[in-house]
Structure formats: C-alpha cells, structure tokens
Amino acid sequence: MNRYSNAFARLKAGSRGAFVPFVTLGDPGIDESLAIIDALVEGGADCLELGFPFSDPLADGPVIQGANIRALAAGTTPDTCFKMIEQIRAKYPELPIGLLLYANLVFANGIEAFYQRAKAAGVDSVLIADVPAEESAPFVAAARAEGIAPIFIAPPNASADTLRLVASLGEGYTYLLSRAGVTGADNKAGMPLDSVLSALKEFNAPPPLLGFGIAEPSQVQEAIAAGAAGAISGSAVVKRIEALKDDMPKLLTELKSFASAMKAAT
C-alpha cells in the first residue's frame, strides 16, 4: 500500500473525502513557505499538491502566476524545492505529497534524473500540466521506475477514449477538472460532472479529486456529493498568501482556519 491508497482507504473508512491544498514552493519565501505548509497540514490537509516556480506557467491564472513570481524573486530553484520537500517528508512521513509542474522543469536535467531526485526527496506523485496522456510515455516509464504515481488530468469535455487512457495510465489519483480554462478562485467550479465521474468509475480510474476554482466549503461538499473522492484548492490558498504575506502570524492563522473549514466540508 502506498501513501495515496492508505490515505484514501482511511478516508473511505470514515466516510470522508480528501481536502488537498496547492501551494507554490518558496512563496513568499522559503521559510515562510514551510510555515504555510505546516499551517495547512495542522488545519486538516489530507495530501499536499506542490508547485515548482516557473517563469511561464501556461495553465495558471494571475493569482498563481503571482506566486511563481514571488517564489522566483525569493531565489527558489528546483534544487531548493527538493530540499524543502525533504524537510516536509521528514516531518510528515505518511502524508501524500504530489508535484504539479511543467515539462520544461522535468526535462532540464533529464527525465529519469528528475524522477530519481523526486523519489529521494519523498515525492509520491507527479502531474505534468502541459503533457497530455497521449504524449506521456517517457514520463510514465520514468515515474513507474521510481515508484512514483503518474497523475493525469481528466477534462470535463474529454472523450471516452481519453478518459479510458487517463484511467489506464494514471495512479494515485485522477485530477478532475471542473471546467476548461486557466486556474483561479474567481472562475468558480462548474458542475455537473456526473458523466465524467461515471466514466472514470467504469474504467477503474484512480480516485478523482476535483480541482480548478474550488474556493469554499460548499464546493467541496458538492464535489464529494457528485462522487469525487475529494477536492484540490489552489488559487483560494494562494490568494490568502498574496493578501497577508506581510503579516505572517495572521496569514498562518487564516490558512489553518481555511483548511479546517474546507476539511470539515469533506
């Protein structure tokens, strides 16, 4: 059993879903970023989804682009990110840790080397935002060689063939998009996703987590009621970081209570 299957089994036994926050590592600074992750875990996060800062994030709206800019300005590099993950893993040995990043960062030092480094740091899964399932073979092979779960996006308008492929290649969880477009809490999650969820179930896909535009507890409740195994919230977390980055005590209190409210909705 890996950390994801353990986490989902534990949640299922308690009739709960997963709350998964996303943050960009190093935003607004390295020490602050580690404190933010502690606050989210203390608030009840079941898994973490972590981004490496990147200068040209295609799928991200302005909020997460701002996080990338702040993290890069703080001197965050991929090497820094792996060192941070080692610290997070040492502190939370059972917590599933996923990476959400772009192919350029994986290619930079060679695909195999990237996954080896990720495994050594304690990473459980990798989602490459700009590599569709159809083009993922070298990434999947490198991930599986290291025992890392390759994660795939299931878009709301996907064909049955795409969903079948996502289900067969993916491990850990399935990233279910609530809508097409760029990320952002202002672009509220759109339901219904019943047809996508039932297709994923039919194809035995890993547990679906709904992402994109998840900003409030009611949306978490809706996602789980629709059949998702949980929800991922990124822009809503990063918005709070942006607003309160100059008042860390207030920010950490706010993030912990946000995570608690989102978790309570599962």
UniProtKB/Swiss-Prot annotation:
It is an enzyme of class 4 (lyase). PROSITE patterns: TRP_SYNTHASE_ALPHA. Keywords: Amino-acid biosynthesis, Aromatic amino acid biosynthesis, Lyase, Tryptophan biosynthesis. GO terms for cellular component: cytosol. Gene3D superfamilies: Aldolase class I (3.20.20.70). It comes from the Bacteria. Pathway: Amino-acid biosynthesis; L-tryptophan biosynthesis; L-tryptophan from chorismate: step 5/5. The active site is at E49 (proton acceptor), D60 (proton acceptor). InterPro entries: Aldolase_TIM, RibuloseP-bd_barrel, Trp_synthase_alpha_AS, Trp_synthase_suA. The keyword Amino-acid biosynthesis applies. CDD domains: Tryptophan_synthase_alpha. Its EC number is 4.2.1.20. GO terms for molecular function: tryptophan synthase activity. The alpha subunit is responsible for the aldol cleavage of indoleglycerol phosphate to indole and glyceraldehyde 3-phosphate. HAMAP family: Trp_synth_alpha (MF_00131). Tetramer of two alpha and two beta chains. This is Tryptophan synthase alpha chain. It comes from Shewanella amazonensis (strain ATCC BAA-1098 / SB2B). The gene is trpA.
